[in-house]
Amino acid sequence: MSFKPLHDRIAIKPIEQEEKTKGGIIIPDTVKEKPMQGEVVAVGNGIRNQKGEIHPLELKVGDKVLYGKWAGTEIEIKGTKLIVMKESDVFGIIN
């Protein structure tokens, strides 16, 4: 099963935080920060304007992005955790 977001939504695979600190201390799940970076794995077709024309999204598959801590909805497809959100919830592309 594959996943294709609709309209102006994108699917992001979060880039997980390190399990250990540089000093070797293991960080438990209860204190880990929620990821705010990820890789775009799927994009919708775009959004319609008032004239009915579809404007494609700026983001593309493979872009590394920064997004809000509480943005989107978490889903799981074939054991892979993804976050689905609107393109406007993304702050920017990481180069």
UniProtKB/Swiss-Prot annotation:
GO terms for molecular function: ATP binding; metal ion binding; protein folding chaperone; protein-folding chaperone binding; unfolded protein binding. This is Co-chaperonin GroES. The gene is groES. Heptamer of 7 subunits arranged in a ring. Interacts with the chaperonin GroEL. It comes from the Bacteria. SMART domains: Cpn10. One of its GO terms (cellular component) is cytoplasm. It is found in: Cytoplasm. Gene3D superfamilies: GroES chaperonin. Its main location: cytoplasm. Belongs to the GroES chaperonin family. SUPFAM superfamilies: GroES-like. Together with the chaperonin GroEL, plays an essential role in assisting protein folding. The GroEL-GroES system forms a nano-cage that allows encapsulation of the non-native substrate proteins and provides a physical environment optimized to promote and accelerate protein folding. GroES binds to the apical surface of the GroEL ring, thereby capping the opening of the GroEL channel. Keywords: Chaperone, Cytoplasm. Pfam families: Cpn10 (PF00166). GO terms for biological process: chaperone cofactor-dependent protein refolding.
